[in-house]
C-alpha cells in the first residue's frame, strides 16, 4: 500500500498540465478596422482546450490589451513547472513584427519581440503558439535564444537548437496577409486548427494529433480556401511527434 501510494503521488507530480492564454480581437477602437471572426475564434479555441482539462485565460477585444496579455503570461509563469505545456494563441489584425492587441496606436500594441521575451521566461516543457494574423511570418525575426539574443540575423535551425521548446504555427509568410471568411465562419488557419485538433489531422488514426500532423492538415486546408496564404510551422524536428491533443 505504501509503495502504491508513493507511485500514485509520483505519477501525479509528473503529470503535465496545460496552461492556455487565448486572445482574439474583433472589435477595435472605432469601427473602421473591425473583424468578424477573431473573438469567436478565440472563444472556440478556449472552449476546446477547457474541454481537454487545460487551465485557460481568455482575453477578447477590449480586454485583450498589451498589458493584460503580458500580465496573463506572467501569471502562468508563476504557476507552471518545467514539465508543463503553455499555449499562446492570438487571432486578429497583424502588422510587421506586431500583433494588434486592443489599442489606439501601434506603439501600444504587443510586438513579437516582447511576446517571445515573456514566453522565454516561462518554465515549460514546450510552448505552443498559434498566431492567426496578417504578416505573422515576421514573428521569425523576433524569437530569442535562452539568453534573449535577437534572432534577426540567425537561421531558424540555430534558434531551435538554442531553445528547442517552441512549436509555433503562423498563418502566413512574412509578406502575406491572412484571411478570415464568414462562409467558413473563422479565420482560415484557426479553422484548420479547430478541425485538426478535433481529429481531422489524425493521419495515422491513433487518436493523437502530433505537431507535424496538425501542420500538414492546416497547410492543406488553408490552401483549399486561399492559394495566396501559406501557413508556417516553426519548431525543432525533435518536437514533430509531440502530441498536442488526443481526441
Residue map of PLM features:
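Bacterial N-terminal signal peptides
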Residues: 1-10
